[in-house]
Structures are given as C-alpha cells and as structure tokens.
C-alpha cells in the first residue's frame, strides 16, 4: 500500500521470505504475481501465478481451505488475465496470440461454479471469445449472466456493452438498438434512485445509517429497497465487506447467546459483553463509511 514494491518482493520471495509449502506460500506467490503485473513483467507474472496455483492446490489437498480456496480462484483468474493481455498484444491473427487467448479461455473455465468469482470469469471469457472471432460463444457468455443466480445477486452492466459490441461487429444494427433499450430500462431507473438515496441521509444520523440501509436493501423485498437491490448485493458481495459483515453478525449472535444463559451473569460475562458491544459499535460506523 505504500508502493514499496521492491521491499514487498523481498519479504514475499520464495528463498529469502515465504518458503514453498508454508501456509502463506499461496498468498505470497499470488501477491508477487500482482507486483509483476504492476511492473508490466507479464512472463514473470504468469510464472508466479502458476506457482501460486500449485501452492493453493497443495494446501487444498491438505485440507487447509480457509484461504487457499480464494487464492486458488484468484490465481486462476490471474493466469487467464495475463494470457488475455499477451494474446491481445500479439493479436488473434498470429498463432502465438491465438494460442494465448485460447489458454485464457481455458483458465477462465477453471473458476469453480457458484463461487463469487464465477460471474467475472464468464464475463471476461466472453471478451476472449470476441477477440477470437467466436461471436456465438461470446454471446453465450452474456446469456449465461442473465440467469437468476447472477441477475439477482450482482450487477453485470458491462455485459450489455459486450453484447452490443458483438452485434455491432456483425452489422446487426437493430439488435444493437434493442440491447441499448434493454440496458436503459434495466439501469435507467437505478441511477436517479441511487442519487436520491445518497442525498437522503438524515442530518442527525451517523455513518452506521449507511450500513443499516444497505443491509435492509440486501435482505428485504426488492420493491422496498432504498438502494436498487442488485446494486446493494453487488456491494455486499465484496470480499472485504462480506468478511467484516460476517464478523459483525457473529458478534451480535454471540452476545445474544451469552445474555440468554443464566450461567453467564458474573463479572467476567459482563466484561466480555462490554468488549463485544464496544467492538460492534466501533465497526458498524466503519462499515457505513466503507
């Protein structure tokens, strides 16, 4: 975060920093790959993401899945995206470029189904097929994103752009116009609704208000959501937000369980409940700002 990338690489290095086979090796190799991408060293990035994938696979086989599952998915995405960039630079008309794009599509398909990264993988694979001139497969990716699993839980507004681009390149102007109309219908009402919400916070309300409104929009009826529900669920699916929200819900349920048991009424229970309440009261406003 301080942009000291060389220092970071020193700590993440397989020999001088985080050794292979350690519990942090998958994350270390993955972060090193991100730095290589930042430095525009795509060949090295590809190698590091492949190392991260191997380390994450070994961790999963050993039963260490708490973090390795996500690193596995992110490493697969990293490999797919690097291949896409390499293929785009070389051009799909060259054998090397076409091969890189085909490898990109292959790795996007490796992202496990029904995970938080599945939708992104399908969408980005659609652009790979477009680059390869496989317009039917590209439109198939867009069609997949209209399934209820995706349409009800996260917004994919960019899929309309991909769809229109496919039609445009095939001179299907009427379908371009129809798709644009569908986009405006789907998202045209969301923008003013979102703008109205952003200006509706009561003056006396604290930052926690934003968090409360988001939670209500995610879980309540779509017609009553003050934030367009698909947008609210997109925000709530953010990895950092989801982890903090899970922690907050756990604090609330644990505190309720403690208060419900007569055995936990002594001084220690009081101190524990006070600590839980203080942690929750500090985190909720932060969640609103986040």
Predicted regions, residues:
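"A position-specific structural signal for the A-helix of alpha-solenoid helical repeats
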Residues: 1, 30-31, 38, 71, ...
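Short solvent-exposed coil/turn linkers within tandem alpha-helical repeat scaffolds
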Residues: 2, 12-26, 54-71, 110-119, ...
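Hydrophobic/aromatic packing residues within the alpha-helices of TPR/SEL1-like helical repeat arrays
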Residues: 12, 49, 56, 84, ...
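Beta-propeller domains
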Residues: 30, 35, 46, 66-86, ...
């Amino acid at each position: 975060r301080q942009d000291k990338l060389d220092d970071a690489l020193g700590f993440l290095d397989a020999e001088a920093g985080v050794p292979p086979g350690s519990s942090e090796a998958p994350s270390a190799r993955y972060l090193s790959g991100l730095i290589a991408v930042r430095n525009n060293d795509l060949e090295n990035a590809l190698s590091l993401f492949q190392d991260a994938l191997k380390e994450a696979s070994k961790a999963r086989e050993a039963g260490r899945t708490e973090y390795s599952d996500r690193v596995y998915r992110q490493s697969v995405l990293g490999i797919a995206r690097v291949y896409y960039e390499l293929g785009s630079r070389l051009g799909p008309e060259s054998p090397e470029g076409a091969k890189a794009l085909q490898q990109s599509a292959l790795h996007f398909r490796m992202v496990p189904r029904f995970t938080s990264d599945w939708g992104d993988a399908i969408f980005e694979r659609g652009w790979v097929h477009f680059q390869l001139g496989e317009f039917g497969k590209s439109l198939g990716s867009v069609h997949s994103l209209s399934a209820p699993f995706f349409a009800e839980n996260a917004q994919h507004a960019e899929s309309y752009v991909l769809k229109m681009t496919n039609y445009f390149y095939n001179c299907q102007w009427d379908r371009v116009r129809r798709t644009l109309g569908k986009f405006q219908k789907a998202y045209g009402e969301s923008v003013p609704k979102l703008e109205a919400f952003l200006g509706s916070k009561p003056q006396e309300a604290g930052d926690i208000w934003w968090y409360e409104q988001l939670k209500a929009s995610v879980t309540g009826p779509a017609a009553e959501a003050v934030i367009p529900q698909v947008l609210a669920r997109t925000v709530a699916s953010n990895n950092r937000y989801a982890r903090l929200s899970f922690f907050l819900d756990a604090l609330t349920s644990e505190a309720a369980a403690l208060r419900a048991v007569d055995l936990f009424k002594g001084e220690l229970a009081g101190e524990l409940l006070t600590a839980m309440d203080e942690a929750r009261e500090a985190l909720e406003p932060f969640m609103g700002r986040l």
